[in-house]
Amino acid sequence: MGVIDFLLALMQDMILSAIPAVGFAMVFNVPHRALPWCALLGALGHGSRMVMMTAGFNIEWSTFMASLLVGSIGIQWSRWYLAHPKVFTVAAVIPMFPGISAYTAMISAVKISHFGYSEPLMITLLTNFLKASSIVGALSIGLSVPGLWLYRKRPRV
């Protein structure tokens, strides 16, 4: 993959991830002045995850690092724009949720209940369920860690 192709794919990924970030921000009644920042943060998070996955990281660690980035930037923007960090961060991480893995695990569970147990279906179910659970865990931990780092009252030692 050439550099130009990678940059075009990255731009496409960032633009397409900004759209659901704004959509969910509107569902969550985010103020209108914060909508462009939610889009930018969603694009930065998803784009950084794509860059890390292209560099060879697996999707779980890439999601964790991207959600750390989203959480840190969201805390900084909340200080600048006098809003709660969740205004920016929650809608921004929703495009990184593992829809395909969760859907595949659910379909495998339905097939097992309908057709009976088979080892390939069980392997598909467990693999996709564990992947989806790990990604959701990485998102939640990655969003909460910057707040624990930056809002700490006691000394670290």
Swiss-Prot record:
This is Probable succinate transporter subunit YjjB. Keywords: Cell inner membrane, Cell membrane, Membrane, Transmembrane, Transmembrane helix, Transport. Its main location: membrane. GO terms for cellular component: plasma membrane. Pfam families: ThrE_2. The transporter is composed of YjjB and YjjP. It is found in: Cell inner membrane. Involved in succinate export with YjjP. Both proteins are required for export. It is a multi-pass membrane protein. The gene is yjjB. It comes from the Bacteria. The chain crosses the membrane at residues 8-28, 55-75, 87-107, 129-149. One of its GO terms (biological process) is succinate transport. Belongs to the ThrE exporter (TC 2.A.79) family.
